[in-house]
């Protein structure tokens, strides 16, 4: 009775709050003819538009989304480049699409239209007469669609057609006005509910799958007979493939057919046509409806072994959502396997299209997700562009429930070192721990790939799992079922869902979910205390920014089942008289939005030692071991092991210790460090990283003795807050380096007497900014460096200096994966006691960036002795010359200034797998041959061929042309092989950099 009362009150409140709600009406009649020789669709639209608003309309916004494929000026083209997809950018005009031949009439009167000022795929139709409330108009126009190749959702591959968002479509008009939106690859749509009558004319041997009910009896009968025949043939075959198959297209039948479809209560119409389709059919009887649902699947030879079971998956998914959300209301459900360039699957009313999947389970999962969109998108027609989480997030939660029910053995999305990885959980934590997450209620056109996945899909799933753990699964499903029944075939917004959860579950839970969806506030529950005993007790403290529920679990003795208790939101919560247990834990599975796990367990919290790494566990007492093998010129092979605490996810405090034994030096070498990650230390900053570390290896050999160095550094990196959509990254750094080198010592007579310690300290202040665009990325940096004087050594070469370094680099992608790259560098000593001297220490500016000029040991070089093959390893700092000139020469060194330019280009006529290129380096610098001579400007240049991979991280460079002085020095290095320089940028090979840069 209480539940019924609450439901009635909530229903009354919801309707009272939405008494100004209205919804426009649309009825489409479309006739279209496919020309599959020219990939053109000729069509006519007759649209009846009902103005149910209280406003008089003078104009209407229409989406002409195929126009997004017409040029590089569309929002689609820009977004594809942000997604690092250049296929459309480099596509020839013949491969692109368009929508033209519009000629609008309104109630028989000609009507003018204008293209939107900002978007070529939106037009504004001026109504000849105002459309008052409660009235209707009939709008007609011919239109022609030039079908693009498959770059996103609409397109064709050969004569396989994916016809989606293909017709002129009015934008939604609601309480907030018109909602025109450009077509996007990532970011879906918002459309009016209505009816469709669509007649398609095309060659007779096409098999068509579409939204709605097929009204052409002969075509329907043909497909049903075909489904019986195809199933028999497929069941008899032993050669069905489970991978991509290149399947030829049959010739089109010269005879044409016209087939008609109708659909009610839908807001879109999609169709797919392919002469190669195999067809399967089944029916599904559901509780709550008298007529069976027709279940269809259309697929090619590609992954046919998996698609043999597709109708069973479709039936199971449709029943699952019907039981848990609401009975499926449409007459049919269809799955199509076809070309798809926008994600793994895409939903439309009653029909979904799926690309390659890779396994039966993955096919089942993707089909289930897309079928689920019939409820969360098809029936609940929220604004997907403004609030993508409302359909993707909630639907992904039900997909997660489906997988738990039908694949209980699959604990995660994949296994890493035999440990299950939940990608929703892992992905959210990886972004949030580094301050890179965004609120789920962010417009989809403001999200880049990873953020779209985490914000629209992952975090809403975790927030709903958090609520279900607290209230129980049934209570949450009841609330969503109520929301569904209240808003089906309408346009709910976030507030409607929040109010439902607040009313059905509790105000606190509703507010917690609201905050999780609309903010970046984090939750952090801590097990403050736990006291063992026959009646143990525990206290919990809320440290996070977000008011959130938590669910704790007792660690039971032996075979006893763990007991679960609920922890309400608040500053602190005490629990007394708990059953006997080994401890208490806030499990990650029950508290998936709790960001910091190190404080989530008390009691049984033993230290664990694992190999390599693992996901973080509550309590955080984990140490990992990594076997290490190293090599350098002096130490030769080094064997050791690394201990660290870095889990797959970033941690607040991370440390590593990696001792190794050098067999050549008979000594311990290695490195170690610690860093502290502070999330959002200031309103303008995303992250502050404080780090300290030390390393020690041998880098010099003399008279049979190896001499070592020790480099210690402390650093602070402040990453500024830039929205990911800007593609801009800014970082401010402060660093102190102390470098101690041991070198042979000599008495006044020149006799070797032990070793001496050379110490240098450097202070650096730097700013770096990058614009990571796909076609023309650019980055610049400025660094101020102060070197302290080594007072223990009486040498002018150890004097202090103040130096300014600037760098500007960029690239232009002129063909797919073929770049022209450029770099400018300028260095100047603001203060330098050696400016008037002809002595050039390794701290001097240098055209060649080799081990000798790496004076602060910033890079990783295989050898630092300066000779042999090791001297051919170069980097691209300072002058960046790709010429292995010996550091024993004063070539390219300056105590005053240095300016250089580095150019290289990938050759346009080469195969992609062999990235040959050409390069040219040039520079000028201030040089004194002797201290008594005035400084003069020297100009040097060198050019040649290159082979590079991994975006230039690995490369080989052969100098072929140069100025005379440079040529002479190159000839002195030896033959052709000795003149080749190579680059192996080892600092970018650390595994954590790979993982962190993915997210």
Model-derived features: positions:
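Hydrophobic alpha-helical and helix-loop surface patches within well-folded domains
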Residues: 16, 25-26, 48, 261, ...
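C-terminal outer-membrane beta-barrel translocator/porin domains of Gram-negative envelope proteins
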Residues: 629, 671, 687-707, 714-719, ...
């Amino acid at each position: 009775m209480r539940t019924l009362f609450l439901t009635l009150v909530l229903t009354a409140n919801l309707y009272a709050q939405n008494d100004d709600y209205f919804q426009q009406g649309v009825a489409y009649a479309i006739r279209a003819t496919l020309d599959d020789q020219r990939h053109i669709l000729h069509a006519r639209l007759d649209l009846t538009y009902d103005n149910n608003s209280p406003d008089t309309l003078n104009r209407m916004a229409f989406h002409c989304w195929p126009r997004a494929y017409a040029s590089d000026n569309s929002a689609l083209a820009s977004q594809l480049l942000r997604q690092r997809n250049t296929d459309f950018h480099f596509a020839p005009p013949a491969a692109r699409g368009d929508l033209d031949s519009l000629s609008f009439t309104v109630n028989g009167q000609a009507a003018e239209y204008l293209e939107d000022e900002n978007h070529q795929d939106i037009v504004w139709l001026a109504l000849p007469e105002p459309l008052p409330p409660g009235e209707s108009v009939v709008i007609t126009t011919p239109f022609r669609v030039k079908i693009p190749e498959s770059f996103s959702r609409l397109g064709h591959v050969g004569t396989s057609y994916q016809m989606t968002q293909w017709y002129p479509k009015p934008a939604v008009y609601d309480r907030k006005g018109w909602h025109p939106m450009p077509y996007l690859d990532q970011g879906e749509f918002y459309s009016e509910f209505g009816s469709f009558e669509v007649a398609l004319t095309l060659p007779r041997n096409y098999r068509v799958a579409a939204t709605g009910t097929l009204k052409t009896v002969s075509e329907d009968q043909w497909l049903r007979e075909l489904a019986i025949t195809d199933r028999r043939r497929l069941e008899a075959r032993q050669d069905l493939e489970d991978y991509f198959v290149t399947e030829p297209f049959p010739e089109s039948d010269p005879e044409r057919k016209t087939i008609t479809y109708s659909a009610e209560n839908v807001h879109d119409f999609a169709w797919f046509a392919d002469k190669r389709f195999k067809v399967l059919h089944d029916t599904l009887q559901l509780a709550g409806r008298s007529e069976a649902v027709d279940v269809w699947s259309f697929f090619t030879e590609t992954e046919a072994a998996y698609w043999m079971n597709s109708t069973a998956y479709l039936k199971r998914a449709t029943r699952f959502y019907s039981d848990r959300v609401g009975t499926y209301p449409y007459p049919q459900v269809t799955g199509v396997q076809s070309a798809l360039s926008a994600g793994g699957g895409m939903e439309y009313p009653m029909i979904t299209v799926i690309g390659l999947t890779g396994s039966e389970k993955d096919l089942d999962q993707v089909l289930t997700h897309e079928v689920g969109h019939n409820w969360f998108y098809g029936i609940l027609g929220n604004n997907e562009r403004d609030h993508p989480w409302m359909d993707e997030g909630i639907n992904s939660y039900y997909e997660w429930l489906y997988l738990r029910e039908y694949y209980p053995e699959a604990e995660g999305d994949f296994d890493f070192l035999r440990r299950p990885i939940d990608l929703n959980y892992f992905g959210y934590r990886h972004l949030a721990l580094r301050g890179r997450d965004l609120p789920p209620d962010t417009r989809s056109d403001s999200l880049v790939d990873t953020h779209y996945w985490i914000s629209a899909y992952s975090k809403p799933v975790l927030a709903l799992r958090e609520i279900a753990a607290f209230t129980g699964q049934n209570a949450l499903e009841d609330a969503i079922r109520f929301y569904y029944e209240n808003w089906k075939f309408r346009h709910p917004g976030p507030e409607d869902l929040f109010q439902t959860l607040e009313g059905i579950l509790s105000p606190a839970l509703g507010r917690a979910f609201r905050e999780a969806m609309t903010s970046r506030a984090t939750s952090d529950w801590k097990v403050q205390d736990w006291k063992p005993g026959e009646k143990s007790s525990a206290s919990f403290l809320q440290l996070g920014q977000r008011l959130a529920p938590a669910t704790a679990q007792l660690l039971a003795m032996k075979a006893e089942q763990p007991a679960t208790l609920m922890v309400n939101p608040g500053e602190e919560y005490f629990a007394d008289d708990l059953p006997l247990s080994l401890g208490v834990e806030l499990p990650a599975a029950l508290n998936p939005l709790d960001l910091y796990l190190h404080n989530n367990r008390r009691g049984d919290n033993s230290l664990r030692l694992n190999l390599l790494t693992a996901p973080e566990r509550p309590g955080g007492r984990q140490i990992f071991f990594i076997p290490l093998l190293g090599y350098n010129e002096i130490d030769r092979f080094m064997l050791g092991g690394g201990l660290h605490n870095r889990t797959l996810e970033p941690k607040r405090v991370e440390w590593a210790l990696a001792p190794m034994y050098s067999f050549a030096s008979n000594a311990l070498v290695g490195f170690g460090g610690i860093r502290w990650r502070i999330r959002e230390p200031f309103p303008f900053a995303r992250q502050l990283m404080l780090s300290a570390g030390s390393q020690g290896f041998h880098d010099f050999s003399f008279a049979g003795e190896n001499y070592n160095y020790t480099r210690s550094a402390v650093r602070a990196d402040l990453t500024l807050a830039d929205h990911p959509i800007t593609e801009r990254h800014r970082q401010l750094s402060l660093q102190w380096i102390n470098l101690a080198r041991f070198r042979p010592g000599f008495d006044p007579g020149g006799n070797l007497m032990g070793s001496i310690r050379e110490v240098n300290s450097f202070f650096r202040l730097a700013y770096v900014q990058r614009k990571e665009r796909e076609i023309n990325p650019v980055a610049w940096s400025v660094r101020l460096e102060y070197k302290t004087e080594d007072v223990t050594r009486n040498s002018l070469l150890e004097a202090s200096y103040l130096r300014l370094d600037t760098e500007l680099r960029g690239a232009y992608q002129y063909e797919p994966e073929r770049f022209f790259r450029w770099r400018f560098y300028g260095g100047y000593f603001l203060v330098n006691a050696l400016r008037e001297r002809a002595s050039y220490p390794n701290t001097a500016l240098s055209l060649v960036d080799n081990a000798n000029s790496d004076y602060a040991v910033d890079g990783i070089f295989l050898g630092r002795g300066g000779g042999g093959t090791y001297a051919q390893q170069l980097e691209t700092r300072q002058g960046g010359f790709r010429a292995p000139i010996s550091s024993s020469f004063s070539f390219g060194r300056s105590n005053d200034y240095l300016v250089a330019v580095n150019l290289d280009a990938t050759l346009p006529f080469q195969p992609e797998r062999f990235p040959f290129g050409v390069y040219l380096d040039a520079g000028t610098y201030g040089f004194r041959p002797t201290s008594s001579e005035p400084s003069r400007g020297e100009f040097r240049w060198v050019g040649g061929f290159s082979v590079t991979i991994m975006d230039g991280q690995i490369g080989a460079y052969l100098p072929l042309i140069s100025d005379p002085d440079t040529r002479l020095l190159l000839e002195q290095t030896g033959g052709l092989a000795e003149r080749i320089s190579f680059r192996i940028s080892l600092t970018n090979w650390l595994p954590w950099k790979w993982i962190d840069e993915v997210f």
